[in-house]
Amino acid sequence: MAILAFQKPDKVLMLEADSRFGKFEFRPLEPGFGITVGNALRRILLSSLEGFAITTIRIDGVEHEFSSVPGVKEDVTNIILNLKQVRFKQVVEEFESEKVSITVENSSEFKAGDIGKYLTGFEVLNPELVICHLDSKATMQIDITINKGRGYVPADENREYCTDVNVIPIDSIYTPIRNVKYAVENFRVEQKTDYEKLVLEISTDGSIHPKEALKEAAKILIYHFMLFSDEKITLESNDTDGNEEFDEEVLHMRQLLKTKLVDMDLSVRALNCLKAADVETLGDLVQFNKTDLLKFRNFGKKSLTELDDLLESLNLSFGTDISKYKLDKE
């Protein structure tokens, strides 16, 4: 059954943008869609984007987080609290984790920037953050492990990275998003004033541009919703190949190829010719070559041109092998 057309934006307007803040506008939206889209994007942005954070530390002479370090003003608990705030940006793609050993001496302060001096694959984004204060003669040896993750992970779940009894797991704040706000306002389309405008503000730690963060959040939502829209996808299989995996492009193509031709804007003549040949969906149509179609009863070049224009507008073409999309799989 054809879906009635929705009033929706044809593009996203970026009102403001730099490396840490972006303001975006979506308009027009159907009544009620502002809060639906805004809330979904906000939750995904805050909870589901990937980032990098410290997962474990080891300090010479320290056995647990309730200890203190000789010559250091802060106890280990406060040192950990400060280390949790250090933000990292990946600068070498091959590096998804890194472990460094740092010696702090002849300094009254240990800052986040001191960690950056030892790193190869990452950049510290807040180098002025003070981790702890030291006496003039104090020395501290600390090992730090950085890993890739998503959202927030408590210390207990980071115990898998502990390779020694004196290694201390810490809470990891992976999310690169600092804050997300959205507002829904009325918007006028011609004579109707009950449409909506969604304004979304995204603040990041600088490891990802707000525009890219928005795109990643949208991809996550699209991927999950596409699973609901394809009733033929099964998550479990008795085949020896095990579970099937579908990327976003395959999911999109499956949905597109299952579209019925009667729902497309085709002439009655073309539809009747195709129906007589049992060609009912886009998937049926794209399997034919142009010469095959011209053999259909009452099918002429005008109808062929009409179908050719339709497929071109959908980035499809005649003579396509659709076997990899498994349209007949139950």
From Swiss-Prot:
<keyword id="KW-0548">Nucleotidyltransferase</keyword>
<comment type="similarity">
    <text>Belongs to the RNA polymerase alpha chain family.</text>
</comment>
<dbReference type="InterPro" id="IPR011263">
    <property type="entry name" value="DNA-dir_RNA_pol_RpoA/D/Rpb3"/>
</dbReference>
<dbReference type="GO" id="GO:0005737">
    <property type="term" value="C:cytoplasm"/>
</dbReference>
<protein>
    <recommendedName>
        <fullName>DNA-directed RNA polymerase subunit alpha</fullName>
        <ecNumber>2.7.7.6</ecNumber>
    </recommendedName>
</protein>
<dbReference type="Pfam" id="PF03118">
    <property type="entry name" value="RNA_pol_A_CTD"/>
</dbReference>
<keyword id="KW-0808">Transferase</keyword>
<feature type="region of interest" description="Alpha C-terminal domain (alpha-CTD)">
    <location>
        <begin position="248"/>
        <end position="330"/>
    </location>
</feature>
<dbReference type="Pfam" id="PF01193">
    <property type="entry name" value="RNA_pol_L"/>
</dbReference>
<dbReference type="GO" id="GO:0046983">
    <property type="term" value="F:protein dimerization activity"/>
</dbReference>
<dbReference type="InterPro" id="IPR036603">
    <property type="entry name" value="RBP11-like"/>
</dbReference>
<dbReference type="GO" id="GO:0000428">
    <property type="term" value="C:DNA-directed RNA polymerase complex"/>
</dbReference>
<dbReference type="GO" id="GO:0006351">
    <property type="term" value="P:DNA-templated transcription"/>
</dbReference>
<dbReference type="InterPro" id="IPR011260">
    <property type="entry name" value="RNAP_asu_C"/>
</dbReference>
<comment type="subunit">
    <text>Homodimer. The RNAP catalytic core consists of 2 alpha, 1 beta, 1 beta' and 1 omega subunit. When a sigma factor is associated with the core the holoenzyme is formed, which can initiate transcription.</text>
</comment>
<feature type="region of interest" description="Alpha N-terminal domain (alpha-NTD)">
    <location>
        <begin position="1"/>
        <end position="232"/>
    </location>
</feature>
<keyword id="KW-0804">Transcription</keyword>
<comment type="function">
    <text>DNA-dependent RNA polymerase catalyzes the transcription of DNA into RNA using the four ribonucleoside triphosphates as substrates.</text>
</comment>
<dbReference type="GO" id="GO:0003899">
    <property type="term" value="F:DNA-directed RNA polymerase activity"/>
</dbReference>
<keyword id="KW-0240">DNA-directed RNA polymerase</keyword>
<dbReference type="Pfam" id="PF01000">
    <property type="entry name" value="RNA_pol_A_bac"/>
</dbReference>
<dbReference type="InterPro" id="IPR011773">
    <property type="entry name" value="DNA-dir_RpoA"/>
</dbReference>
<dbReference type="GO" id="GO:0003677">
    <property type="term" value="F:DNA binding"/>
</dbReference>
<dbReference type="InterPro" id="IPR011262">
    <property type="entry name" value="DNA-dir_RNA_pol_insert"/>
</dbReference>
<dbReference type="InterPro" id="IPR036643">
    <property type="entry name" value="RNApol_insert_sf"/>
</dbReference>
